Amino acid sequence: MRLKKSIKRGIAAVTITGIMASSAMPAFAKDYHIEYGDIKVDQDKVSYTDKDGTKYDNEKNEDGDITITGKSDENTVSVKDADVTFKDLEIDRSASSTAADGAAVSVSGNSSIELDGKNTISSGMGHAGIEKADDNGTMTIKDDNNVSGSLTANGGFGGAGIGGGNGADGSDITISGGNVTANGGGHAAGIGGGSSSSSGGGNGSDITISGGNVTANGGTAGAGIGGGDGDAANGLNKESDSTGGGRGSNITISGKNTIVKAEGGAEAAGIGGGRSGDADTIEITDSTVISNGHDSDNGNSGAGIGGGGFGAGGGAGGGISNITIKDADVTAGADAGGAGIGSGNASGLIIYYPNWKDEHPNEGVASDITISGGRVKASGGDDSAGIGGGYLGSGSDITIKDNADVTANGGKWGAGIGGGRGGDGSDISISDSNVSASGGAAGAGIGGGRGGKGENVTISGSSTVSVKHGPGATLTSGTCYGAGAGIGNGGGKDDVRGEEIAPDISGIDSTGQGYINYYDSDNNLLTRVPSAPAPEENDSKGDDAEPALSASMKQAVSQLEVRGALRQNLMQDTSIVQQDYDADAHVLTIRAELSIATLTGTLGSLKALQAQGVTTIALVTQHCTSTLDLAELTALGGEDTVFSLVHTAGIPALSVGGALHNELIH
C-alpha cells in the first residue's frame, strides 16, 4: 500500500510540474491564414478565423511574432500599432467595385510589415493596395531578415499603390528594404497620395526610402512618388485660386544600395507633384534614382523630379522649391512641358490669367535646386529646361557644387539650365564641378528659355563648363525665333538672337584647370577664364630664328585668324602674333603672346597650307603648346567646315564643324 501511495504521489508531482512549466512557456510563433477569413491585428491582439471555421477575437499573441500568409480574393488585413510579417501573401480584391468593401490591407498607427517571400496585394475601387488609414504614426515596409522579400502593391481606381485611398493623403511612409513595386490606380500616386476630391486629399508627404529596390508607377495623373491627381479638385482656377491637392513634399531617398525607379502618370511628375500639384523638399542622397514625368500627348507633362503638369480642370502646373541631390546617381527626364528637374507645365496660367506673370509670379517656378557631388543627367521635354522651369516656368537659385558631374539638356524652346519656354533663368551658381548644358531651339545654354531672360550666372573654382546655345527655329506659322545665347537670354520673335551676358568668372581657378567654353548665338566658340599673369619678356630670339614666310605662304596663312579673349582678330598684329615655318619638318608655328587664344579658319584654308607643303600646324601661347596633323584635320569635313583650336590658360580644346575633337590635339 505504501508503495502504491508513493507512486501516486510521484505521478501527481510530475503532472503538476509539467502543468507549471507549460503555463510559463510562451506560445509558439503562429501563422495566420488569410484564406480562412479577415485578419485584424491591434497591437498584440489578433482576430482571425482558423481552418475549422472557428473565429477568435482579440486573441493575445504572446511572443509578438505575427506572420500572415495564404491567398484570398475576398478577405482583408488590418494592422494597428503592430509589427507583422507578410509571407507569400496574396490578396486580390481588384474586382471590388465599391469603396465600402475596404482596402485589401489597411495600416494605421506605428506599424511595420516585414517581407518574406513573394507578396502581392491588390485593392479595388477607391482604395490603396496597402492603405495608410490615418495620419497617426509611421508605416514601415522592410526586409530586415534579408531573405529577398518582395511586395507588389496595386491600388484600385483612386487609390495609391502604397499610401492614400480616394480623397485621402498618403503620409508618413517608410521603405527600408525589400524589392517593392507600387502601382497607383487611376488618378493616384504609386507611393503617396490617392486622388484628391472637392473635400481635399491627394497629397503625398513624409515619404522615406532608405533601402531596397523600389519601383513606383503613378496611375493617370498621379506621381510615381508623391501627390495624386490635384486636378480632380479643379486645381487652380479663377474662383478658388487653390491647387486642391496633388502636392508631393518631404520626400527623402538615401542609401548607397538604394535603387529607385519612378514613373509619373500622364501629366504628373516621376517624383513630386501629381497633376496640378506642386512639390516641396525632395532630398536624394547616396542612392541611384531614375525618374520620369509624363504627359498625355498634349504637352502637359510633369517634371522628372519636381512639380506636376497642368490638367483639364485649370491647374497651373506644379512649381517646386528645395530639391537637394547629394552624392547620388540621378537620371531625370520628362515629356513635353516638364523639366527634367524642376517644374511642370504651367500653361493653365495662360488660359485663366491673361496677366499671369503679374498675378501669379511664383506659379510654375523652380527654385532652390542644389546638386552637390555625384552624377546627374537631366533632360527636359519640349518647352522645358533640363534643370529649371517647365513650360512658362522660370528657374532660379540653382546651385551646382562639390565636384558634381552634371549634364542638362533643354527640350525645344527650353534652356539647358534656367527657364522653360517664356521663363527666365537667374541666380545660377557653378563651383568646382563639371557641367555640360545645352539649350533647345531658341533656348540659352544657361539662362532664359525662348523669350526669357538670363541673369546672375556665377562660375568659380576648378569648374569645367561646356555650354551650347539652342539654334534658331521657325514655327509652322512662319514665325522665326532667333538662336538662344550661350549664357544669357533666349531667342525672340523675328529672328532676334538671345543677348549674351557676361558670367561672373572672377572666382575661376585657372591654375586648377577651371574654364568655360560656350557657343554664342552667332555660333562662335567662346572661352572665358580670368586673365593669367604674363610671363617675363625675353626679347632675345637667338641665332636660330626661322626665316620669314614666303609670299605664297603668307597668302595661305592670311586665311586663318588668331582671336584674343575679346574675339578680335590679332593675326596681323606682329607685336602679339608671329608665324614661322620649318621647311625641313614641314611645320608652321604660330606664336601668340596671349593666355587665351583661338586659332580658327576653314578646312579649305588648311588645304591651302597643305598645298604649300605644310603637314603640321602648331599654336604656342603663354601657357600651352599644341600641334595638329593637317591630314587628320582636313579629313573631317568640306572646304567650308570651320575649325577652332582654343587655348584657355594651359588647356587646349579643338572643335571641327561644331563637334569636339580633342583626340586630334598632339
Identify the residue ranges that each predicted region occupies.
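Long, contiguous ectodomains of secretory-pathway proteins
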Residues: 69, 80-87, 92-94, 99-101, ...
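A composition-driven surface/loop motif
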Residues: 3-543
